[in-house]
């Protein structure tokens, strides 16, 4: 789990997301509170529940990007899901409990990687012995072993060469475990546990024996380390730790929650909107979900919901769900100045990406200050006159601007281009000023 302070978390988010200080502060405090809670006594800890967050803001201002970056910082089970992918229990479609099952699978993978990392040294030793056995096979008959000292010395010589990398390109025949092939079984509602058991049964039945393969020692060493590390991991301990990790540190990001708001009066069951909200209630409030790894309690899982709320309002959510999302954060619409900062300030910004891509063809690109201002202004104007899609408009504008250079780059190795205000004007002015063209091209 991340032990970063709120200030450090905001600083990390600043490297990728422009503006939106309120949203950054809220998620930073929520993430830090996960760590603070774990410092409390076990009895008192159970009484401290997470304060779930609802992020409200137009499309393209950074809601989803905050989730993506938070996932990397959290160092805890994290899943991002679209609320529109689910339907009410009993109808065709995914049930909301699948969110927790997927989150548990992520925790299993995360815990397995951590445990395999702890026993990596032992795994390397075992892998090394297997490679030496392949290089220096033991004699088939005991009477062939005439000089054990000589054999031992030879093994030590090869061990030294192996560790120094002198044998990396040598090919050997080695027995490698075959990857297991899973079988997907569609289950009727309420029978997920039976489906999981059937999947496990078929998976075990389909285990293929180890297959002898010819490969270079460097490649074989990596495969054997993974195989040996997997053998050293205790599967029961792994499941217990993963479930504990989900229950205490799990984070669920529910995107597009505004799309499941009820709009106006409708006849018949609203299975993909209000029905989904009703099914989400017990998850957010706290319930027990059955997974193939065991029972998972959701009482202390942090839920962060987000939506544009252009066609609906937060008050259109059912009251019970509103009450379970107590912290509200509004994200601001982006200005032309924000667009300019987005083009230059973040790590691996759009301009840096195009410079690096064209450099692979031997073409030098330079973005002048005037050019960056013109690009930002053009994107902002198109957003104002047509649909406002936020920073995503920059991708469209930049791709149109760089279209000719990208097409001809392979034939112009050694060339240099300066993207200034004149260049931007020549390539974008007609599109920006013509509203019909803007709607279809930008």
UniProtKB/Swiss-Prot annotation:
Gene Ontology MF terms: ATP binding; ATP hydrolysis activity; peptidase activity; proteasome-activating activity
Residues given in the record as ATP binding sites: 18, 60-65, 255, 320, 392
Record-linked InterPro entries: AAA+_ATPase, ATP-dep_Clp_protease_ClpX, ATPase_AAA_core, Clp_ATPase_C, HslU, P-loop_NTPase
Main subcellular location of this protein, as a coarse class: cytoplasm
Entry's Gene Ontology BP terms: protein unfolding; proteolysis involved in protein catabolic process
Span list, region Disordered: 133-156
Disulfide cross-links: none
Subcellular localization, as worded in the UniProt entry: Cytoplasm
Keywords, ordered alphabetically: ATP-binding, Chaperone, Cytoplasm, Nucleotide-binding, Stress response
Keyword Calcium: no
Keyword hit for Chaperone: yes
Transmembrane segments: none
GO-annotated cellular components: HslUV protease complex
Family: Belongs to the ClpX chaperone family. HslU subfamily.
Known role: ATPase subunit of a proteasome-like degradation complex; this subunit has chaperone activity. The binding of ATP and its subsequent hydrolysis by HslU are essential for unfolding of protein substrates subsequently hydrolyzed by HslV. HslU recognizes the N-terminal part of its protein substrates and unfolds these before they are guided to HslV for hydrolysis.
Quaternary context: A double ring-shaped homohexamer of HslV is capped on each side by a ring-shaped HslU homohexamer. The assembly of the HslU/HslV complex is dependent on binding of ATP.
Record-given protein name: ATP-dependent protease ATPase subunit HslU
UniProt source species: Shewanella sp. (strain ANA-3)
Highest classification ranks of the organism: Bacteria, Pseudomonadati, Pseudomonadota, Gammaproteobacteria, Alteromonadales
């Amino acid at each position: 789990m991340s032990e970063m302070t709120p200030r450090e978390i905001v600083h990390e988010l600043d490297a990728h997301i422009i503006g939106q200080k309120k949203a950054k502060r809220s998620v930073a405090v929520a993430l830090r509170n996960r760590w603070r809670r774990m410092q409390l006594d076990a009895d008192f800890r159970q009484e401290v529940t997470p304060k779930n967050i609802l992020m409200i803001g137009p499309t393209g201002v950074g809601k989803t990007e905050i989730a993506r970056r938070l996932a990397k910082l959290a160092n805890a089970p994290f899943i991002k899901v679209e609320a529109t992918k689910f339907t009410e229990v009993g109808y065709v479609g995914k049930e909301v409990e699948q969110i927790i099952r997927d989150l548990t699978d992520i925790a299993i993978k995360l815990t397995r990687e951590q445990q395999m990392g702890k026993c990596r040294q032992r795994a390397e030793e075992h892998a090394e012995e297997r490679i030496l056995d392949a290089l220096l096979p033991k004699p088939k008959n005991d009477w062939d072993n005439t000089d054990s000292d000589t054999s031992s010395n030879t093994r030590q010589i090869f061990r030294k060469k192996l560790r120094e990398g002198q044998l990396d390109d040598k090919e050997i025949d080695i027995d490698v475990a075959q990857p297991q092939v899973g079988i997907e079984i569609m289950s009727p509602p309420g029978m997920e546990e039976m489906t999981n058991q059937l999947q496990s049964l078929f998976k075990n039945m389909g285990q293929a024996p180890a297959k002898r393969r010819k490969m270079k020692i460097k490649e074989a060493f990596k495969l054997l380390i993974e195989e040996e590390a997997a053998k050293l991991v205790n599967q029961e301990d792994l499941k217990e730790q993963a479930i504990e990790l989900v229950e205490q540190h799990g984070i669920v990001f529910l995107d597009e929650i505004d799309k499941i708001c009820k709009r106006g009066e409708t006849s018949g069951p609203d299975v993909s909107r209000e029905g989904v909200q009703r099914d989400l209630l017990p998850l957010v409030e706290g319930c027990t979900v059955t997974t193939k790894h065991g029972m998972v309690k959701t009482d202390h899982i942090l839920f962060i919901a987000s939506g544009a709320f252009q066609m609906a309002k937060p008050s259109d959510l059912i009251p019970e769900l509103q009450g379970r999302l107590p912290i509200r954060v509004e994200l601001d619409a982006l200005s032309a100045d924000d667009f300019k900062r987005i083009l230059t300030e973040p790590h691996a910004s759009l301009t840096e990406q195009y410079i690096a891509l064209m450099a692979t063809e031997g073409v030098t690109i330079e973005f002048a200050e005037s050019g960056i201002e013109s690009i930002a202004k053009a994107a902002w104007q198109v957003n104002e006159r047509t649909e406002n899609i936020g920073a995503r408009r920059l991708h469209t504008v930049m791709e149109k601007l760089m279209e000719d250079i990208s097409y001809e780059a392979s034939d112009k190795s050694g060339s240099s281009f300066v993207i200034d205000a004149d260049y931007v004007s020549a390539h974008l002015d007609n599109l920006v000023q013509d509203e019909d063209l803007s709607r279809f091209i930008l």
